[in-house]
Protein backbone atom coordinates (compact mmCIF):
# COMPACT_ATOMS: atom_id res chain seq x y z
CA UNK A 1 0.00 0.00 0.00
CA UNK A 2 1.40 3.40 -0.92
CA UNK A 3 1.84 5.88 1.91
CA UNK A 4 -0.17 9.11 2.04
CA UNK A 5 2.94 11.11 1.15
CA UNK A 6 3.66 8.81 -1.78
CA UNK A 7 0.09 9.12 -3.09
CA UNK A 8 0.30 12.92 -2.81
CA UNK A 9 3.48 12.92 -4.89
CA UNK A 10 1.87 10.64 -7.48
CA UNK A 11 -1.19 12.89 -7.67
CA UNK A 12 1.06 15.92 -8.24
CA UNK A 13 2.83 14.08 -11.07
CA UNK A 14 -0.53 13.19 -12.61
CA UNK A 15 -1.72 16.78 -12.53
CA UNK A 16 1.56 17.98 -14.02
CA UNK A 17 1.25 15.30 -16.69
CA UNK A 18 -2.27 16.40 -17.61
CA UNK A 19 -1.14 20.02 -17.75
CA UNK A 20 1.78 19.15 -20.04
CA UNK A 21 -0.42 17.13 -22.37
CA UNK A 22 1.06 13.75 -21.43
CA UNK A 23 -1.60 11.05 -21.25
CA UNK A 24 -1.51 7.50 -19.91
CA UNK A 25 -4.78 5.76 -20.72
CA UNK A 26 -6.09 2.64 -18.99
CA UNK A 27 -8.83 0.42 -20.40
CA UNK A 28 -10.74 -0.45 -17.26
CA UNK A 29 -12.63 -3.54 -18.45
CA UNK A 30 -12.53 -6.59 -20.71
CA UNK A 31 -15.08 -8.61 -22.69
CA UNK A 32 -16.23 -10.58 -19.64
CA UNK A 33 -16.40 -7.75 -17.08
CA UNK A 34 -20.22 -7.73 -17.16
CA UNK A 35 -20.17 -11.12 -15.41
CA UNK A 36 -18.56 -9.74 -12.25
CA UNK A 37 -20.52 -10.66 -9.11
CA UNK A 38 -21.39 -7.50 -7.21
CA UNK A 39 -20.91 -5.33 -10.29
CA UNK A 40 -17.89 -4.24 -12.31
CA UNK A 41 -18.05 -0.62 -11.21
CA UNK A 42 -17.76 -1.72 -7.59
CA UNK A 43 -14.81 -3.99 -8.34
CA UNK A 44 -13.02 -1.20 -10.20
CA UNK A 45 -13.66 1.18 -7.31
CA UNK A 46 -11.45 -1.04 -5.17
CA UNK A 47 -8.62 -0.76 -7.69
CA UNK A 48 -8.50 3.03 -8.09
CA UNK A 49 -5.46 3.40 -5.82
CA UNK A 50 -3.50 0.83 -7.85
CA UNK A 51 -4.45 2.61 -11.06
CA UNK A 52 -3.44 6.04 -9.81
CA UNK A 53 -0.19 4.66 -8.36
CA UNK A 54 0.71 3.49 -11.87
CA UNK A 55 0.57 7.05 -13.19
CA UNK A 56 -2.65 6.68 -15.21
CA UNK A 57 -4.34 9.93 -16.29
CA UNK A 58 -7.47 8.61 -18.08
CA UNK A 59 -9.60 5.51 -17.43
CA UNK A 60 -11.73 4.18 -20.29
CA UNK A 61 -14.97 2.71 -18.92
CA UNK A 62 -17.41 0.38 -20.74
CA UNK A 63 -20.56 1.58 -22.54
CA UNK A 64 -22.79 2.92 -19.74
CA UNK A 65 -26.30 2.52 -21.15
CA UNK A 66 -28.98 -0.14 -21.50
CA UNK A 67 -27.98 -2.62 -24.19
CA UNK A 68 -29.41 -5.69 -25.89
CA UNK A 69 -25.96 -7.27 -25.66
CA UNK A 70 -24.48 -7.79 -22.21
CA UNK A 71 -21.21 -6.02 -23.03
CA UNK A 72 -23.01 -2.78 -23.93
CA UNK A 73 -22.24 -2.53 -27.65
CA UNK A 74 -25.86 -2.90 -28.84
CA UNK A 75 -27.35 0.09 -27.00
CA UNK A 76 -31.02 0.96 -26.87
CA UNK A 77 -32.31 3.24 -24.10
CA UNK A 78 -29.31 5.56 -23.96
CA UNK A 79 -30.42 7.56 -20.91
CA UNK A 80 -31.03 4.38 -18.90
CA UNK A 81 -27.79 3.83 -16.99
CA UNK A 82 -29.41 1.53 -14.42
CA UNK A 83 -29.95 -1.25 -16.96
CA UNK A 84 -26.22 -1.69 -17.58
CA UNK A 85 -24.76 -5.08 -16.67
CA UNK A 86 -21.72 -3.31 -15.18
CA UNK A 87 -23.64 -1.75 -12.28
CA UNK A 88 -26.11 0.97 -11.36
CA UNK A 89 -26.01 4.63 -12.27
CA UNK A 90 -25.10 5.52 -8.68
CA UNK A 91 -22.22 3.03 -8.70
CA UNK A 92 -20.98 4.53 -11.96
CA UNK A 93 -21.17 8.07 -10.58
CA UNK A 94 -19.35 7.01 -7.41
CA UNK A 95 -16.58 5.43 -9.47
CA UNK A 96 -16.18 8.52 -11.64
CA UNK A 97 -16.13 10.69 -8.52
CA UNK A 98 -13.39 8.50 -7.02
CA UNK A 99 -11.34 8.82 -10.21
CA UNK A 100 -11.78 12.59 -10.21
CA UNK A 101 -10.66 12.69 -6.60
CA UNK A 102 -7.33 11.22 -7.72
CA UNK A 103 -6.95 13.55 -10.69
CA UNK A 104 -8.00 10.93 -13.27
CA UNK A 105 -10.40 11.63 -16.14
CA UNK A 106 -13.15 9.16 -17.11
CA UNK A 107 -13.63 8.16 -20.75
CA UNK A 108 -17.10 7.01 -21.85
CA UNK A 109 -17.34 4.32 -24.51
CA UNK A 110 -19.76 6.03 -26.91
CA UNK A 111 -21.69 3.67 -29.19
CA UNK A 112 -23.76 5.83 -31.56
CA UNK A 113 -23.27 4.31 -35.02
CA UNK A 114 -26.15 1.91 -34.43
CA UNK A 115 -28.93 1.46 -31.93
CA UNK A 116 -31.43 -1.24 -30.95
CA UNK A 117 -35.15 -0.51 -30.89
CA UNK A 118 -37.63 -1.43 -28.17
CA UNK A 119 -40.72 -1.91 -30.30
CA UNK A 120 -41.89 -3.08 -33.73
CA UNK A 121 -43.65 -0.85 -36.22
CA UNK A 122 -46.70 -1.79 -38.30
CA UNK A 123 -44.43 -3.82 -40.61
CA UNK A 124 -43.31 -5.99 -37.69
CA UNK A 125 -39.78 -4.56 -37.74
CA UNK A 126 -37.94 -3.41 -34.63
CA UNK A 127 -37.43 0.27 -35.44
CA UNK A 128 -39.30 2.21 -32.73
CA UNK A 129 -36.75 3.54 -30.25
CA UNK A 130 -37.19 4.45 -26.59
CA UNK A 131 -34.75 6.96 -25.10
CA UNK A 132 -35.02 5.95 -21.45
CA UNK A 133 -36.69 9.12 -20.11
CA UNK A 134 -40.34 10.06 -19.37
CA UNK A 135 -40.22 12.66 -22.16
CA UNK A 136 -39.57 12.21 -25.87
CA UNK A 137 -35.78 12.52 -25.94
CA UNK A 138 -34.25 9.90 -28.25
CA UNK A 139 -37.71 8.41 -28.92
CA UNK A 140 -37.19 7.81 -32.63
CA UNK A 141 -38.86 5.98 -35.49
CA UNK A 142 -37.70 4.29 -38.71
CA UNK A 143 -37.13 7.67 -40.41
CA UNK A 144 -34.07 8.06 -38.14
CA UNK A 145 -32.46 5.03 -39.81
CA UNK A 146 -30.26 5.27 -42.91
CA UNK A 147 -32.38 4.45 -45.94
CA UNK A 148 -29.79 2.07 -47.39
CA UNK A 149 -30.10 -0.03 -44.23
CA UNK A 150 -33.01 -1.81 -45.90
CA UNK A 151 -33.36 -4.40 -43.14
CA UNK A 152 -34.72 -1.76 -40.75
CA UNK A 153 -35.43 1.57 -42.48
CA UNK A 154 -38.61 2.86 -44.08
CA UNK A 155 -36.65 4.40 -46.94
CA UNK A 156 -37.05 8.03 -45.86
CA UNK A 157 -33.71 8.66 -44.13
CA UNK A 158 -30.42 9.83 -45.61
CA UNK A 159 -27.80 7.48 -47.01
CA UNK A 160 -25.28 6.08 -44.55
CA UNK A 161 -22.07 8.09 -44.39
CA UNK A 162 -19.89 5.14 -43.37
CA UNK A 163 -19.61 1.38 -43.16
CA UNK A 164 -22.66 -0.80 -42.58
CA UNK A 165 -23.32 -2.48 -39.24
CA UNK A 166 -25.51 -5.48 -40.04
CA UNK A 167 -26.59 -6.50 -36.53
CA UNK A 168 -28.55 -3.34 -35.66
CA UNK A 169 -30.12 -0.29 -37.33
CA UNK A 170 -27.60 2.21 -38.71
CA UNK A 171 -28.61 5.60 -37.38
CA UNK A 172 -29.01 8.51 -39.81
CA UNK A 173 -26.46 10.98 -38.48
CA UNK A 174 -27.33 13.56 -41.15
CA UNK A 175 -30.73 14.00 -39.51
CA UNK A 176 -30.79 17.25 -37.50
CA UNK A 177 -32.88 15.77 -34.68
CA UNK A 178 -30.45 12.86 -34.35
CA UNK A 179 -27.47 15.20 -34.16
CA UNK A 180 -29.13 17.50 -31.65
CA UNK A 181 -30.46 14.78 -29.35
CA UNK A 182 -27.26 12.73 -29.37
CA UNK A 183 -25.25 15.87 -28.61
CA UNK A 184 -27.61 16.63 -25.72
CA UNK A 185 -27.13 13.07 -24.42
CA UNK A 186 -23.35 13.41 -24.59
CA UNK A 187 -23.53 16.74 -22.76
CA UNK A 188 -25.62 15.02 -20.09
CA UNK A 189 -22.97 12.31 -19.74
CA UNK A 190 -20.41 15.11 -19.37
CA UNK A 191 -22.46 17.08 -16.85
CA UNK A 192 -22.12 16.86 -13.08
CA UNK A 193 -25.08 14.48 -13.13
CA UNK A 194 -22.84 11.71 -14.52
CA UNK A 195 -19.34 13.17 -14.82
CA UNK A 196 -17.58 11.77 -17.89
CA UNK A 197 -14.70 13.84 -19.27
CA UNK A 198 -13.84 12.28 -22.63
CA UNK A 199 -15.05 9.93 -25.37
CA UNK A 200 -14.02 6.70 -27.02
CA UNK A 201 -15.93 6.50 -30.31
CA UNK A 202 -16.91 2.90 -31.01
CA UNK A 203 -17.02 1.71 -34.65
CA UNK A 204 -16.19 5.18 -35.94
CA UNK A 205 -15.92 3.66 -39.44
CA UNK A 206 -19.71 3.59 -39.41
CA UNK A 207 -20.13 7.34 -39.88
CA UNK A 208 -18.08 10.02 -41.58
CA UNK A 209 -15.41 12.13 -39.87
CA UNK A 210 -17.62 15.15 -40.57
CA UNK A 211 -20.35 13.53 -38.46
CA UNK A 212 -17.86 12.75 -35.69
CA UNK A 213 -16.78 16.39 -35.81
CA UNK A 214 -20.36 17.47 -35.04
CA UNK A 215 -20.34 15.51 -31.78
CA UNK A 216 -16.79 16.44 -30.81
CA UNK A 217 -17.35 20.15 -31.38
CA UNK A 218 -20.82 19.97 -29.83
CA UNK A 219 -19.34 18.72 -26.55
CA UNK A 220 -16.25 20.95 -26.47
CA UNK A 221 -14.33 21.25 -24.24
CA UNK A 222 -13.78 17.52 -23.99
CA UNK A 223 -10.61 15.87 -22.69
CA UNK A 224 -10.20 13.71 -25.79
CA UNK A 225 -12.26 11.85 -28.36
CA UNK A 226 -10.40 8.77 -29.55
CA UNK A 227 -11.86 6.87 -32.49
CA UNK A 228 -11.85 3.14 -33.13
CA UNK A 229 -11.07 2.84 -36.85
CA UNK A 230 -10.12 -0.80 -37.26
CA UNK A 231 -9.48 -1.62 -40.91
CA UNK A 232 -7.50 -4.46 -42.45
CA UNK A 233 -3.82 -3.90 -43.14
CA UNK A 234 -2.06 -4.79 -46.39
CA UNK A 235 -0.89 -8.43 -46.32
CA UNK A 236 1.58 -10.32 -48.47
CA UNK A 237 1.34 -13.80 -49.92
CA UNK A 238 2.93 -15.23 -46.77
CA UNK A 239 0.02 -14.01 -44.67
CA UNK A 240 2.14 -11.42 -42.89
CA UNK A 241 1.69 -7.65 -43.05
CA UNK A 242 3.50 -5.89 -45.86
CA UNK A 243 6.49 -3.85 -44.69
CA UNK A 244 4.97 -0.59 -45.96
CA UNK A 245 1.72 0.26 -44.17
CA UNK A 246 1.57 3.91 -45.20
CA UNK A 247 -1.90 3.58 -46.75
CA UNK A 248 -3.23 2.11 -43.51
CA UNK A 249 -1.91 4.89 -41.32
CA UNK A 250 -2.82 7.53 -43.89
CA UNK A 251 -6.50 6.62 -43.44
CA UNK A 252 -6.15 7.20 -39.69
CA UNK A 253 -4.35 10.50 -40.16
CA UNK A 254 -6.98 11.60 -42.71
CA UNK A 255 -9.73 11.02 -40.12
CA UNK A 256 -7.94 13.28 -37.64
CA UNK A 257 -7.53 15.95 -40.31
CA UNK A 258 -11.21 15.83 -41.23
CA UNK A 259 -12.46 16.18 -37.64
CA UNK A 260 -10.43 19.33 -37.16
CA UNK A 261 -6.78 18.35 -36.93
CA UNK A 262 -4.62 19.98 -34.28
CA UNK A 263 -7.47 22.20 -33.07
CA UNK A 264 -9.73 19.20 -32.38
CA UNK A 265 -9.86 16.76 -29.45
CA UNK A 266 -10.09 13.99 -32.06
CA UNK A 267 -7.54 11.18 -31.84
CA UNK A 268 -7.24 7.63 -33.19
CA UNK A 269 -6.21 4.28 -31.82
CA UNK A 270 -2.98 3.45 -33.62
CA UNK A 271 -4.03 0.16 -35.19
CA UNK A 272 -1.12 0.45 -37.62
CA UNK A 273 1.42 0.28 -34.81
CA UNK A 274 -0.54 -2.53 -33.15
CA UNK A 275 -0.55 -4.66 -36.31
CA UNK A 276 3.12 -4.09 -37.08
CA UNK A 277 4.16 -4.87 -33.49
CA UNK A 278 2.17 -8.12 -33.47
CA UNK A 279 4.47 -9.48 -36.17
CA UNK A 280 7.65 -7.55 -35.37
CA UNK A 281 8.13 -9.07 -31.91
CA UNK A 282 8.21 -12.54 -33.47
CA UNK A 283 11.79 -12.11 -34.67
CA UNK A 284 11.09 -9.39 -37.24
CA UNK A 285 11.95 -6.23 -35.32
CA UNK A 286 13.33 -4.68 -38.50
CA UNK A 287 9.71 -3.75 -39.19
CA UNK A 288 9.76 -1.05 -36.49
CA UNK A 289 11.23 1.62 -38.75
CA UNK A 290 9.77 3.12 -41.90
CA UNK A 291 11.56 4.15 -45.08
CA UNK A 292 12.19 7.63 -43.65
CA UNK A 293 13.75 6.31 -40.44
CA UNK A 294 10.66 7.03 -38.33
CA UNK A 295 8.26 4.80 -36.42
CA UNK A 296 6.07 2.95 -38.95
CA UNK A 297 2.67 3.65 -37.37
CA UNK A 298 0.64 6.80 -36.77
CA UNK A 299 3.20 7.71 -34.09
CA UNK A 300 5.72 8.23 -36.90
CA UNK A 301 3.53 10.86 -38.56
CA UNK A 302 1.26 12.44 -35.95
CA UNK A 303 2.12 11.06 -32.50
CA UNK A 304 0.09 13.65 -30.58
CA UNK A 305 -3.07 12.17 -32.13
CA UNK A 306 -2.14 8.48 -31.74
CA UNK A 307 -3.29 6.23 -28.90
CA UNK A 308 -1.01 3.20 -28.84
CA UNK A 309 -2.00 -0.11 -27.29
CA UNK A 310 -0.95 -3.74 -26.99
CA UNK A 311 -4.42 -5.33 -26.79
CA UNK A 312 -8.01 -4.42 -25.94
CA UNK A 313 -11.35 -6.15 -25.27
CA UNK A 314 -11.66 -7.12 -28.95
CA UNK A 315 -8.12 -8.02 -29.99
CA UNK A 316 -7.35 -9.80 -26.73
CA UNK A 317 -9.50 -10.79 -23.73
CA UNK A 318 -11.68 -13.83 -24.49
CA UNK A 319 -12.42 -12.71 -28.06
CA UNK A 320 -8.80 -13.03 -29.25
CA UNK A 321 -9.54 -11.38 -32.58
CA UNK A 322 -5.98 -10.09 -33.09
CA UNK A 323 -3.97 -10.93 -29.99
CA UNK A 324 -0.46 -9.77 -29.24
CA UNK A 325 1.90 -12.75 -28.79
CA UNK A 326 1.29 -13.62 -25.15
CA UNK A 327 4.94 -14.26 -24.26
CA UNK A 328 5.98 -10.90 -25.73
CA UNK A 329 3.39 -8.62 -24.12
CA UNK A 330 5.92 -6.78 -21.96
CA UNK A 331 7.99 -6.05 -25.06
CA UNK A 332 4.90 -4.33 -26.42
CA UNK A 333 4.57 -2.24 -23.27
CA UNK A 334 8.28 -1.42 -23.26
CA UNK A 335 7.72 0.00 -26.75
CA UNK A 336 4.52 2.02 -26.26
CA UNK A 337 5.40 3.31 -22.77
CA UNK A 338 8.74 4.73 -23.87
CA UNK A 339 7.79 5.96 -27.33
CA UNK A 340 5.87 9.00 -28.58
CA UNK A 341 2.10 8.68 -28.73
CA UNK A 342 -0.46 8.29 -25.97
CA UNK A 343 -0.14 4.77 -24.53
CA UNK A 344 -3.13 2.76 -23.29
CA UNK A 345 -2.73 -0.03 -20.72
CA UNK A 346 -5.15 -2.98 -20.80
CA UNK A 347 -6.86 -4.15 -17.59
CA UNK A 348 -6.12 -7.83 -18.19
CA UNK A 349 -2.38 -7.35 -18.53
CA UNK A 350 -2.15 -5.04 -15.53
CA UNK A 351 -4.27 -6.95 -13.03
CA UNK A 352 -4.95 -10.48 -14.31
CA UNK A 353 -1.56 -11.28 -15.84
CA UNK A 354 0.46 -10.12 -12.83
CA UNK A 355 2.28 -7.42 -14.82
CA UNK A 356 1.26 -4.47 -12.64
CA UNK A 357 4.72 -3.79 -11.19
CA UNK A 358 6.53 -4.10 -14.52
CA UNK A 359 4.08 -1.83 -16.32
CA UNK A 360 4.09 0.72 -13.50
CA UNK A 361 7.89 0.78 -13.55
CA UNK A 362 7.85 1.65 -17.26
CA UNK A 363 5.29 4.41 -16.72
CA UNK A 364 7.47 5.78 -13.92
CA UNK A 365 10.48 5.96 -16.25
CA UNK A 366 8.34 7.76 -18.84
CA UNK A 367 7.01 10.32 -16.39
CA UNK A 368 10.28 10.77 -14.52
CA UNK A 369 12.00 11.73 -17.76
CA UNK A 370 9.20 13.87 -19.14
CA UNK A 371 8.52 11.64 -22.15
CA UNK A 372 5.33 12.81 -23.87
CA UNK A 373 3.27 12.09 -26.96
CA UNK A 374 5.51 14.35 -29.03
CA UNK A 375 8.91 13.33 -27.70
CA UNK A 376 11.75 12.89 -30.18
CA UNK A 377 12.65 9.38 -31.33
CA UNK A 378 16.02 8.17 -32.58
CA UNK A 379 16.05 4.56 -33.79
CA UNK A 380 19.53 3.19 -33.11
CA UNK A 381 19.11 -0.46 -34.16
CA UNK A 382 16.44 -2.38 -36.05
CA UNK A 383 17.61 -5.93 -36.64
CA UNK A 384 15.48 -9.07 -36.61
CA UNK A 385 16.35 -9.91 -33.00
CA UNK A 386 16.89 -6.45 -31.50
CA UNK A 387 15.36 -3.00 -31.64
CA UNK A 388 17.00 -0.12 -29.76
CA UNK A 389 15.76 3.47 -29.61
CA UNK A 390 16.59 6.67 -27.77
CA UNK A 391 13.80 9.00 -26.68
CA UNK A 392 14.44 12.70 -26.02
CA UNK A 393 18.09 11.92 -25.33
CA UNK A 394 16.98 10.82 -21.85
CA UNK A 395 15.73 7.24 -22.22
CA UNK A 396 17.09 4.28 -24.18
CA UNK A 397 15.05 1.11 -24.65
CA UNK A 398 15.66 -2.30 -26.16
CA UNK A 399 13.34 -5.14 -27.08
CA UNK A 400 14.15 -8.49 -28.65
CA UNK A 401 15.93 -11.74 -27.91
CA UNK A 402 19.44 -10.34 -28.34
CA UNK A 403 20.91 -9.88 -24.88
CA UNK A 404 23.94 -7.64 -25.36
CA UNK A 405 23.37 -4.20 -26.84
CA UNK A 406 25.75 -2.48 -24.42
CA UNK A 407 27.79 -0.89 -27.20
CA UNK A 408 24.75 1.25 -28.09
CA UNK A 409 24.01 2.54 -24.59
CA UNK A 410 25.42 6.07 -24.18
CA UNK A 411 27.71 6.91 -21.25
CA UNK A 412 25.92 8.01 -18.11
CA UNK A 413 22.85 5.83 -18.63
CA UNK A 414 21.79 3.25 -16.04
CA UNK A 415 19.33 0.37 -16.15
CA UNK A 416 15.90 1.54 -14.93
CA UNK A 417 13.57 -1.35 -15.84
CA UNK A 418 13.95 -4.77 -17.40
CA UNK A 419 12.25 -8.09 -17.94
CA UNK A 420 11.84 -10.90 -20.44
CA UNK A 421 13.05 -9.52 -23.77
CA UNK A 422 13.20 -5.85 -22.81
CA UNK A 423 15.34 -3.31 -20.97
CA UNK A 424 15.12 0.44 -20.40
CA UNK A 425 17.92 2.80 -19.39
CA UNK A 426 17.78 6.40 -18.20
CA UNK A 427 20.35 9.08 -17.48
CA UNK A 428 22.04 9.00 -14.09
CA UNK A 429 20.29 12.15 -12.82
CA UNK A 430 16.86 10.61 -13.31
CA UNK A 431 17.98 7.34 -11.76
CA UNK A 432 19.37 9.19 -8.74
CA UNK A 433 16.14 11.15 -8.33
CA UNK A 434 14.13 7.93 -8.45
CA UNK A 435 16.32 6.36 -5.78
CA UNK A 436 15.96 9.44 -3.57
CA UNK A 437 12.19 9.35 -3.99
CA UNK A 438 12.17 5.67 -3.04
CA UNK A 439 14.25 6.38 0.09
CA UNK A 440 11.88 9.21 1.08
CA UNK A 441 8.85 6.97 0.64
CA UNK A 442 10.47 4.16 2.61
CA UNK A 443 11.35 6.52 5.47
CA UNK A 444 7.81 7.91 5.55
CA UNK A 445 6.40 4.40 5.96
CA UNK A 446 8.61 3.53 8.96
From Swiss-Prot:
GO MF term set: alpha-amylase activity; calcium ion binding
Name assigned to this protein: Alpha-amylase isozyme 2A
Cofactor(s) needed by this chain: Ca(2+)
InterPro entries named among the record's database cross-references: A-amylase_bs_C, A-amylase_pln, Alpha_amylase, Glyco_hydro_13_cat_dom, Glyco_hydro_b, Glycoside_hydrolase_SF
Signal peptide: 1-21
Active site: 202 (nucleophile), 228 (proton donor)
PANTHER family attached to this UniProt entry: ALPHA-AMYLASE
Gene Ontology biological process terms in this record: starch catabolic process
EC number, as in UniProt: 3.2.1.1
SMART domains per the UniProt record, alphabetical: Aamy, Alpha-amyl_C2
Cofactor note: Binds 3 Ca(2+) ions per subunit.
Natural source organism: Oryza sativa subsp. indica
Record's catalysed reaction(s): Endohydrolysis of (1->4)-alpha-D-glucosidic linkages in polysaccharides containing three or more (1->4)-alpha-linked D-glucose units
Chain positions of site Transition state stabilizer: 314
Pfam families: Alpha-amyl_C2, Alpha-amylase
Miscellaneous section: Binds starch not only at the active site, but also via accessory binding sites on the protein surface that are important for efficient binding to starch granules and thereby increase enzyme activity.
Binding-site residues, Ca(2+) 2: 130, 133, 135, 139
Family in the record: Belongs to the glycosyl hydrolase 13 family.
Binding site for Ca(2+) 1: 113, 160, 163, 170, 206
Keywords: Calcium, Carbohydrate metabolism, Glycosidase, Hydrolase, Metal-binding, Signal
Assembly information from the UniProt record: Monomer.
Amino acid sequence: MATGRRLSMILLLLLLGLASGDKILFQGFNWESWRQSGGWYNLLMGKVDDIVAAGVTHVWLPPPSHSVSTQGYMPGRLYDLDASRYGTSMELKSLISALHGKGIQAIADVVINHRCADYKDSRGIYCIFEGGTPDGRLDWGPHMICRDDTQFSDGTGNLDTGADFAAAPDIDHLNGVVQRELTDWLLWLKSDEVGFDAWRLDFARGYSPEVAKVYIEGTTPVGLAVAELWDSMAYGGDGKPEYNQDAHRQALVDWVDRVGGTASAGMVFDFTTKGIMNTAVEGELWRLIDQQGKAPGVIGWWPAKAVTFVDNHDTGSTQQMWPFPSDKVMQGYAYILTHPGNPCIFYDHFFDWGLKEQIAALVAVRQRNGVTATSSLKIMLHDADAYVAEIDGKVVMKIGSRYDVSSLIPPGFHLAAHGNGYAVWEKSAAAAAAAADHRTSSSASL
